[in-house]
Amino acid sequence: MKIEILHFDKFKFDHEEQLHDIYIKRISQFRNIITDIKTVKINNKGIENRLVKKNANECFVSLDEKGEHFSTEDLKVFLFNNNFKNLKFIVGSTDGIQKGILEKSNKVISLSRMTLTHSFALIILLEQIYRSATIVSNHPYHRV
């Protein structure tokens, strides 16, 4: 499975970018279950174009505070028990995600009921993807 995280804004602080890089590197160690992971800075038009051209192997998941609440276990099941070869997560800008993009997404999930900065949402998502991969791989990172 390939995972692509589409986001609108750049990191404001060096430590945010460092955390991003750490989790991308950690996730990349699990090539047997996640063949590729990357983050792509994009605009609304770029996302709309991708949504119009999506195929049956792609799943677009928007992050929105009003979305379905997922536990770590829910995310793990969603990531590794689906038929999609390409998962594309959309992390909104300061203004959130446009209604049309939310409506065209396959799923809308919430990381928290609280409002998060786009960079924190992106880092939390990466950490949870990493945690899910460690659970599936019986890696000691996740302790129950």
Regions found by a protein language model. Name each.
Residues 16-21, 72-73, 102, 122:
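Conserved strand-to-helix beginnings and helix N-cap segments that scaffold or border functional pockets
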Residues 6-8, 63, 90:
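Short hydrophobic segments within beta-strands
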Residues 1-27:
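N-terminal beta1-alpha1 ligand-phosphate binding loop
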Residues 30-88:
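S-adenosyl-L-methionine/SAH cofactor-binding core of RNA-modifying enzymes
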Residues 84-104:
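Ser/Thr/Gly-rich flexible loops in soluble cytosolic domains mediating phosphotransfer, phosphorylation
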Residues 65-68, 93-96, 114:
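Short glycine-rich anion-binding loops that position phosphate/pyrophosphate groups of nucleotides
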Residues 99-143:
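Structured adenosyl-cofactor binding patch, chiefly the S-adenosyl-L-methionine
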Residues 23-26, 77-82, 104:
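Catalytic-core regions built around general acid/base machinery
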